[in-house]
Amino acid sequence: MDDNILGSQVFQIAGTKEHIIIKFVNGDLAGTYIIISPEDLEIKLKLWKANDKPLCNIPGKAFEVYKIDFVYQVANIGAYERDQIKHLEEGKYALVLNGNNIDKLFTGSPKTRGKPLMKESLKIEIPTAVLSVDTGDAQTPSNPPSVKRFINVWLKDRADNLYDPKVKPIEKDQVFTLNFDIDLISRSESIVSDTVLNYNFLPGEDVVAVTVRLETDDFDVFDEREKKLFLPLSGPSKNRVSFSIAPKHDGDSTVTVVFLKDGNFIQLITLKFDVGGNVPYSRNELGRDLSVVEFIQPRDINLTILNSIDGYQLILSGAVGAMATLAIKLPELKEMIREARQALMGIVNYNENNRFIFQDQVSIPEAVNQKVLPSLAEAGYRLYQRIFFSPSSDPNVQNLGKKLRQILQSEPCKIQVFSQDFVLPWGILYLADRLDRANIQPSLFLGLRHIIEHIPLQKDMLVIENKINCASGLNISLNVNKDIDKTMGPLVSSQEKYWEAIRLNNPNVKVIYRTTKNEVLSALEDPKASDQVLYFYCHGISQDVEETGGVDASTLILSGNDKLTIKDLSIDAPIVDRLLNEPLVFINACESAELSPLVFDGFVPYFVAKGARGVIGTECKVPAKFAVEWARRFFDRFLKGEALGEIFLALRQELYNDEHNLLGLLYALYVDCDTRIFPSIISD
């Protein structure tokens, strides 16, 4: 339906053949959602037009009777809200939003109470009579174009004079003011240059708050470490923020500054000084261009983890902020992760009466669950303790660990992790204050309570719209090892049948089948390849840097033992030829050799650099039957338009609560957790 029917009053209109949902952005019902039938809307418009009044001036009170009773955000739906929806009174409506997008509509009708009537993807057809109404000069609000703006950073001394550290090194105990703003130009006094900050403003959004968080171990900071810049729709920021700092010591000294919007990482600036020395000042920037994203969903917690000389610098942002340096070197990190993943493998290989229970079935007896649950909780608890409460942990590290655990023990959160090579099996972290093996609480596993996305931190990070456009249909490729069926039963063929059924019921779905290395390489070397989802169901081997062949030897094994390595991909399908369709890559590596703790070093960076929007991967080998079941349940929800993070959390909880199966924790998201298809392919 055209958004200009009610002129500047309307922000969004969507619906079904029976219902139209409208949001008003100004006037009597500003911010209100109404639900109305096409017939009633047509009558209202005709009556208003009959009085020779412009449609853009139609009063909101004319629609007050159609006001929706309950409006929720997906991220805030809890037990109370679900109960309200389930017991809606007849004639009442409940609307669920995902940001500014309409997600589901519920009605109190006895026939459909508690069931969603529509998805945001369903669009209505406008009756001819409505289309013929003259809309006059009404203007439709729309997303204004993104304006290119720059972060400026400059130093001033105590006398308020500009200070250029590239000309004169700073001195120990000397107090400076470190200043930040956002401007239309990169000014000459800025000690960083051409550092762009882009953001896509929403309709009706005039000013946004950008959080500036400063962290350092090398400088005294005489201010709050977190401040806000207010960025208007156009022009420079409304304000500047300043931090008074003084070097604690001579030599290498670093200041790290993180920029966030609603908990979402935007930009990282690292300023490096040689205090009292002669080494030139330097800086490094890593950032994301958010102007391509229609709506940025808030994140409750952001963890930015940076490589440092002493280990890893961890910056916590959110309701509580903190910074600490983890005295952990890469070899120790690998060993920690290896031990944690051994616990996962202990579940995969659990043997009782000569039966590998988790490999033979998806539904696990409760008695078996109670035997494996304490060992996984111990591994997750031990991993958290080694990170934050080891003998080498200083008070800052321990304090950050306590704060983070306290936050994560409360309400469910969306967690965003940015790191360079600090890659954990985040889902298995067990967040109890003390480990009580006789009373393990599954909700204290991070992955059974929270949504977690892990995004690689790199220069010029590509940000892709989190909606996969399926207006013309969906193209998915199944890249499989058919030999799996010869030894394990019809696991590949069952997935082919699943997709054939989807295709037959949805002519706009195109399924591409590939079984060999050359077929996959041929597709990946073509920038115009049609794949929107690249799904792999095959064996996989992930090599560490120090192992024979290194990362280049990481392998996906297709039919006929056809081995596709990272080396093959880099030579025959190089990253310079980016995939224009920006596919989502799902590597469902089953019954494979144990994956390296740094699988991140192989397939994830290759596909992201190649243009993929992100990767779904596994922490270690997954039983073949479970991999098929996870994929089926995943695509059932994904094709309905649900977001990846919501799918992961729901499936993990569903499989554990209903089947006593913990293996959902084996899967990880290296992609924006709000990624979804739009419009949906199938309905509820």
Question: What is the meaning of each model-derived region?
Answer:
Residues R437, I541-R613, W630:
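Cysteine protease catalytic core and zymogen-processing segment of caspase-like enzymes
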Residues F150-F201:
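Contiguous beta-strand segments within globular domains
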Residues S443-C470, S559-L580, K625, E629-D684:
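Caspase-like cysteine protease fold
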Residues K92-L97, S253-K261:
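Short, aromatic- and glycine-rich surface loops/edge beta-strands on solvent-exposed regions
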Residues L306-P395, N399, Q406-S410, F418-F422, ...:
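A domain-level signal for caspase-like cysteine endopeptidase catalytic cores
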Residues I102, L260-L268:
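Short acidic/polar inter-strand loop motif in beta-rich domains
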Residues M118, L122-N161, L271-A324:
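Acidic, serine/threonine- and proline-rich intrinsically disordered appendage/tail regions
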Residues A79, S237-H249:
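Short, hydrophobic beta-strand segments
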